[in-house]
């Protein structure tokens, strides 16, 4: 019988990150690209945060099947939908255990109280835990769940009822998203009593396949496999390590050297070498994503349509596709990818026309040499593998029409925080779909409810918003599509964004990794995954 070393013995044996070593089959190192802002997924909106939290440490009532967009039972074994489409009764799974750690020992199993705590904390600003630890839940509010969930009721220990104010065709898909990760009410009570509620974001307790062991910011995160997981066949790794490095070239070298077994977001320039490495495989799939420029319409001169039109048509998008994506990008036209149902193929892009752009700026009264800021992301993403280069190319394009753009960047968590606060003029942003529904694009990124969150253009159009909200209240997909197509036309006409590209997603990994599935939502899930050298 093969003996598995405990983590302490594994470390003591000198098997540390940064030096070549032979991995036991139960250990896996993931070369990650950034540190999570925290470990409470409901507070955040990025894949970096979710990789380290929701898909690793937590479960939801329903969750997406690995590698797909279908919502399947998880902490809820089944659910019933009322005839009016506004009530959902969830039948909870029995025998689910919360993590047991040196800072929390659960005395009971998962039940309805945990569901109530999770959602009431986000719904009620006067909730005792939220008052003790004030925080916002931007994704929850971006989707309008704070307004549409009328109440959450405990029917008994293993049944919970949600009542909505309006029909929401995407409700089950939304509950499968990271923001709906179930927290332990018992643990929250312990933290509240100890006067340390903020530790819910530092020392997480979930029901997920892995348990947090240690975290060193900007260096590594260590998890151990959850031996009490309710689906034990999914835990095939004893020790999961996130080795954090923001440099994609360094991550690629570490992967080739065997210092990690899987990474993400490779630079297009590194793909050929990774594909040719004898010890690696590089699966790929079309990206469910969009990289774009967002114009903050609350800042002058971006409040003028002519200015946004001018900046849009001054960008040489094809040159960016060629230089930044190097064959892995497709020209974007709309505010969501063509793989999303309801995408309107009749919409055409504005022509690249710097001369016309100059005319529009003159018409808008914008002086030659007007200065603005252009924010560039500090991280690589499939939808933007080199934001610095993209920003420099856009800067050069805008200089040709008399606009001086100063490039600004921040650490990723700060970048998102400041963007939500609206400090930018124009910024590079992007999105990978989170639930397979058009609402996740058209409402989350451009809707009025999202202007303090992921709608970083701060654009709120009443006619557009009416269409998007109406589509969410209809169950017939053809009718929803028609409404969403009308909304896409308004979005294109009003130019709160310049769509740049959709990209192919590549996921380089060792040939020893088995069972990993590329997520259409760009999540990196390691349950069901084995490393067998």
From Swiss-Prot:
GO MF annotation terms: peptide transmembrane transporter activity
Localization terms from the record: Periplasm
UniProt keywords, alphabetically: Peptide transport, Periplasm, Protein transport, Signal, Transport
Signal peptide (residue range): 1-24
Listed InterPro entries: Peptide/Ni-bd, SBP_5, SBP_5_CS, SBP_5_dom
Keyword Signal among record annotations: yes
Keyword DNA-binding listed: no
Task performed by this protein: Binds different dipeptides. Probably bind only L-amino acid containing dipeptides.
Protein family: Belongs to the bacterial solute-binding protein 5 family.
Protein name: Dipeptide-binding protein
């Amino acid at each position: 019988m093969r003996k598995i070393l405990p983590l302490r013995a594994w470390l003591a044996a000198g098997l540390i990150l940064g030096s070549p070593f032979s991995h036991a089959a139960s250990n896996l190192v993931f070369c990650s690209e950034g540190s999570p802002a925290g470990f409470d997924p409901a507070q955040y909106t990025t894949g970096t945060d979710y990789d380290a939290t929701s898909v690793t440490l937590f479960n939801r009532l329903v969750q997406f099947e690995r590698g797909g967009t279908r919502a399947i039972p998880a902490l809820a074994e089944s659910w019933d939908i009322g005839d009016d489409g506004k009530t959902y009764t969830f039948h909870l799974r029995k025998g689910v255990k919360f993590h047991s750690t040196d800072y929390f020992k659960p005395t009971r199993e998962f039940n309805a109280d945990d569901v109530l705590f999770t959602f009431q904390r986000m719904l009620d600003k006067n909730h005792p835990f939220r008052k003790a630890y004030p925080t916002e839940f931007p994704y929850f509010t971006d989707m309008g769940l704070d307004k549409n969930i009328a109440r959450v009721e405990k029917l008994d220990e293993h049944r919970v009822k949600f009542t909505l104010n309006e029909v929401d065709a995407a409700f089950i898909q939304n509950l499968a998203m990271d923001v709906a990760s179930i927290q332990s009410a018992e643990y929250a009570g312990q933290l509240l009593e100890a006067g340390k509620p903020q530790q819910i974001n530092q020392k997480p307790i979930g029901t997920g396949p892995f348990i947090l062991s240690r975290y060193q910011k900007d260096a590594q995160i260590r998890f151990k496999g959850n031996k009490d997981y309710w689906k034990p066949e999914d835990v095939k790794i004893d020790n999961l390590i996130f080795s954090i490095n923001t440099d994609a070239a360094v991550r690629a070298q570490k992967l080739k050297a065997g210092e990690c077994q899987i990474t993400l977001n490779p630079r297009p320039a590194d793909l050929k070498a990774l594909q040719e490495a004898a010890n690696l495989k590089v699966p790929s799939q079309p990206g469910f994503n969009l990289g774009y420029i967002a114009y903050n319409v609350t800042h002058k001169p971006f409040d003028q349509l002519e200015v946004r039109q001018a900046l849009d048509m001054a960008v040489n998008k094809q040159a960016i596709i060629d230089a930044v994506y190097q064959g892995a990008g497709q020209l974007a036209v709309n505010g969501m990818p063509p793989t999303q149902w309801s995408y309107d193929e009749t919409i055409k892009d504005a022509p690249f026309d710097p001369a016309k752009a100059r005319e529009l700026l003159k018409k808008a009264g914008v002086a030659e040499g007007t200065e603005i800021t252009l924010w560039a992301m500090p991280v690589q993403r499939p939808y933007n593998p080199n934001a610095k280069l993209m920003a420099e190319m856009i800067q050069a394009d805008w200089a040709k029409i008399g606009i001086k753009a100063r490039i600004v960047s921040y650490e990723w968590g700060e970048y998102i925080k400041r963007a939500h606060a609206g400090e930018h003029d124009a910024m590079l942003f992007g999105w990978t779909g989170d639930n397979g529904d058009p609402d996740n694009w058209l409402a989350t990124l451009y809707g009025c409810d999202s202007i303090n969150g992921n709608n970083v253009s701060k654009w709120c159009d009443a006619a557009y918003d009416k269409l998007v909200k109406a589509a969410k209240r209809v169950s017939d997909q053809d009718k929803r599509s028609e409404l969403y197509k009308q909304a896409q036309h308004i979005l294109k006409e009003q130019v709160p964004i310049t769509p740049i590209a959709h990209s192919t997603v590549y996921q380089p990994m060792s040939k020893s990794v088995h069972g990993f599935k590329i997520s259409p939502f760009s999540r990196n899930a390691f349950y069901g995954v084995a490393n067998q050298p």
